[in-house]
């Protein structure tokens, strides 16, 4: 996992919990270790029974501010069928 996500792990998880997220996994270039300076951060999330009123927009905005990069979040249910197996195989729990 790229240092950016690793060093900010606790803050990412804190923000996620505040928005009702119960699990966070990193996938894509950050998980593979081939992220470049312009790479975004792809997060596979599990949402609890009571997400915040500002979910998911508030979570994404706060994570982008924290990480200084574009952030995309998706749930397993929201994964495209063509990408599902690859994403699940490379996803690394935070």
Show which residues each predicted segment covers:
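A short, structured beta-strand/loop element
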Residues: 37-38, 43
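Conserved histidines in hydrophobic membrane contexts and catalytic metal-binding motifs
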Residues: 26
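Catalytic core of pol beta-like nucleotidyltransferases
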Residues: 1-23, 31-37, 48-94
């Amino acid at each position: 996992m790229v240092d950016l996500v690793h060093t900010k792990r606790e803050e990412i998880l804190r923000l996620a919990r505040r928005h009702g997220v119960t699990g966070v996994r990193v996938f894509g270039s950050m998980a593979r270790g081939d992220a470049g300076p312009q790479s975004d951060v792809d997060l596979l999330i599990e949402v609890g029974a009571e997400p915040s009123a500002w979910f998911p927009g508030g979570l994404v905005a706060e994570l982008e501010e924290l990480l200084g990069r574009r952030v995309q979040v998706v749930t397993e249910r929201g994964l495209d069928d063509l990408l599902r197996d690859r994403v699940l195989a490379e996803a690394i729990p935070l």
